[in-house]
Amino acid sequence: MALTPAVNDINAWINFFCTAEIPVLKNTTLEIEQLKQDEDRLCARALTATIINDPMMVFRVLCYSQKNKSSHQLQDLVQVEQAVMMMGTTSFFKNIPTNFLVEEILENNPIALKHLLKLIHRAHRAAHFAADWATHLADLRAEEIHTAALLHDLAEMLMWCFSPEKMNIIHKMQEADKTIRSVTAQQNVLGFKLQDLQKALVEAFQLPPLLSKLMQDDASTEQRVRNVALAVNLARHSANGWSDAALPDDFHDISELLRIEINRVKRIVGAPELE
């Protein structure tokens, strides 16, 4: 494995990620290997069902698809199943190896692994919220919204993999002082904000422009972008329960997005009824 950057330089990290192999979850590798051995079950849909459980694997598939798209391909592929179908299962197994595991990288740092797995769980909740709301809004391409929400915090996931010590410091700072904003802690420890790393990462890997736009919180006046941003916020603020002070504002914003009552928003997202 290439040496991680010793300096707090966002460009150095982008250069590192561009040459580093992106790890995947152990369970992803096991399930894909099982499919590889089972010709009766092996198909693009079965592979997709496994891939979408792992944000880093989703990222790898979309990056490969974008980098190797045919000259006859008229549009970028944002949906994983479409990307797998276009490359075919033979090309998938040949060009996207899954033997570099998150659990091996963080074998000696179980605390970082715990935080990473929690972050991945949060990403899945955000993706579920976003896709559910997209359906409510009659968005015919809800899968694109799902993918954008799932990958919204990819940079943070990768930093937990490759810079767990610094990420642990950030976490401890925020645990010790709840008033410290995450971007402040990140700037102090890493020398940059993770949202800036995310933007640079998406640009460097040339992900589809649509996906990039859907993950841009600063463009959240547009309905689809706002959907993703609000889903990510809700998943973050409710990660440790439903008592976070930011949740009332989240519920209000979601009610405006969906054009429904706040009490109905709470029922839809599974928030408990408080006396």
Task: Go through each PLM region and give its residues.
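Conserved alpha-helical "signature site"
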Residues: 1-165, 186-248, 252
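Substrate-binding clefts and substrate-entry loops adjacent to catalytic sites
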Residues: 177-186
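Extended, compositionally biased alpha-helical segments that mediate assembly or anchoring
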Residues: 271-275
